[in-house]
Amino acid sequence: MTEEKKENQKIVNLIIISDSVGDTAFNMVQAGAVQYPNVKFNYRRYPFITNREKLEKVFSEITEFENVLIAFTLIHEDEQLAVIKFAREHNMKYVDLLSGVIDNIHALTGEEPKHEIGAVHHMGQNYFDRISAMEFAVMYDDGKDPKGFLEADVVLLGVSRTSKTPLSLFLANKNLKVANLPLVPQTHIPDEIYKINPKKIIGLTNDPSVLNEIRRQRMIAYGLNPDTTYSNMDSINAELEAADKLYKKLGCYVINVAHRSIEETAALILEHLGIDDYAK
């Protein structure tokens, strides 16, 4: 990233407060954050905040922060109200990730919630598998560590702007361990890619015109000239041709993501893998 882009990049401080481990809140916030690739997010997690004293310590740490969104999962109402009061007094945004669901279920059923901290962790191994898959997707996003390719259930390949990261997180929510690799011109393909069962590899592609428009809009969002090598049609066609050549060499399944939602692309991947339990 150029210095100019760094200076213009918007930054949001995401504060995650929970009276349990905070994984639920973190995953929900992260699922929203990935929709903003041009924004830098600074995450701060505060788990096991089970009383007012601990909450006040959190407040003292974050009071000087700017551009803050506080996301919280707190069972007890007095802690919830304390967070809301603090956020309003310090001009911070906030979102209560739990109360809306609990209150609406109560309204529909008349049943009283048990107000048990960390109750979600009694959901069984399926819950922990999902959390593990989400952590795996984050750890091995953008080819950060090639060893992840050998451990993954699915490996996504694709040029820039083919939805690799949001797809990884969506599939992780299906308990699949997903790693992805951006295909960058003149960049070495890790040896591990050639050692993977081709059925586990998904090659993502896009229509050149769609990719051109997406990349141009991204450059405009950065306040930069949209007519660059990155968005040039000749460069895009060369990237897509190189990717197609690699996909043929690997013998992997290829999906054109143009005009497809993340859910539609994920459904094709699950079908290819022979997974039809969409509630997994």
UniProtKB/Swiss-Prot annotation:
GO terms for molecular function: ADP binding; ATP binding; phosphotransferase activity, phosphate group as acceptor; protein serine/threonine kinase activity. It holds the Pfam family Kinase-PPPase. InterPro entries: Kinase-pyrophosphorylase (IPR005177), P-loop_NTPase (IPR027417), PPDK_reg (IPR026565). Keywords: Kinase, Nucleotide-binding, Serine/threonine-protein kinase, Transferase. It comes from the Bacteria. It catalyses: N(tele)-phospho-L-histidyl/L-threonyl-[pyruvate, phosphate dikinase] + ADP = N(tele)-phospho-L-histidyl/O-phospho-L-threonyl-[pyruvate, phosphate dikinase] + AMP + H(+); N(tele)-phospho-L-histidyl/O-phospho-L-threonyl-[pyruvate, phosphate dikinase] + phosphate + H(+) = N(tele)-phospho-L-histidyl/L-threonyl-[pyruvate, phosphate dikinase] + diphosphate. Bifunctional serine/threonine kinase and phosphorylase involved in the regulation of the pyruvate, phosphate dikinase (PPDK) by catalyzing its phosphorylation/dephosphorylation. This is Putative pyruvate, phosphate dikinase regulatory protein.
